Amino acid sequence: MSKTEKAKVYFTDFHTIAFGDGLPTKLKKLIRKAGIGSIDMKGKFVAIKMHFGELGNISYLRPNYAKAVVDVIKELGGKPFLTDCNTMYPGSRKNALEHLECAWENGFTPLTVGCPIIIGDGLKGTDDIAVPVAGGEYIKEAKIGRAVMDADVFISLTHFKGHETTGFGGTIKNIGMGCGSRAGKTDQHSSGKPHVKEKLCRGCRRCQKECANGGLVFDEASRKMHVDAEHCVGCGRCLGACNFDAIEFDNNAANELLNCRMAEYTKAVVDGRPNFHISLVVDVSPNCDCHGENDVPILPNLGMFASFDPLALDQACVDACLAAAPMPGSQLAKHLADPDFHDHHDHFTNSTPESEWKSCLAHAEKIGLGSREYELITL
């Protein structure tokens, strides 16, 4: 695409006609029209990056949408698999066994989606690869799940929603944060070094074996591990080594810095190979699907979007959301009724005032991830 040419973003709404095509069929038509068929997938491994939802949360994308994408990829001769990487925090997705069980319980199985499910950074979240970030200002090498990078073709399938830290969770967050290994997520979230929660430490020393820098010291008297701040480099390897959630990083990176790091991680994932992106603005909960609960949607179901440009796709989804009326009774509507919230045209700031969400899009454009200028093509 030339610098003067706008990125193309394709759109269709969620309306259907009685006894006509269902939403999975509409999604198939959308991605075909958007040009997914131009990617050579014959005999190639195709990663479909999505979020399977935390246990207790039911606002994540239904497996039916994943199945629709899988069907199209198979028609094109590809070998698809669904993937996500483990979380840096305790929950139902912190290791591959629990992550898969969570995915199955939430409806994602080979039977329902038509392809295997592979956790991208392995059993403990330590199976990653260092990927250079071209033009990165904050990240020189991104720690990406190995299975994600081993794929020949990369597809993202995103549930576009609000987010308590980044303002919104779109394509860039799905890719950048989602494809980071446990250490990679730590790399983005934390500005410091870990600490050991002594009550949970069993003194097994697994974490110490993973540390290449002498950053962990075992106290023989207490039989507990401690962080040596002088030697710890904050790489996050110890996080995946602990089976007892005794090692923790503070989520203390400033929101603007977090947003910029996510954009750079996204660039590491998509650079140099075929990629295509899908985003569904549906069940727009105020918080991330990483929560074990979900609140009522802050915005109506707006539609399905697809593009080869991840930045243009996020921008189009943002613009659609900002133009929509808030849902009555939602967190956003309650905030708008508060006289302390003055910018009635910025739903994401009004929902999460400290998010600095615009910094993600601006930095993504600066580093060449894509374009914020787009042509919206409605089906």
At which residue positions do the language-model features occur?
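Extended, low-polarity segments enriched in aliphatic/aromatic residues
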Residues: 2-50, 55-57, 61-65, 72, ...
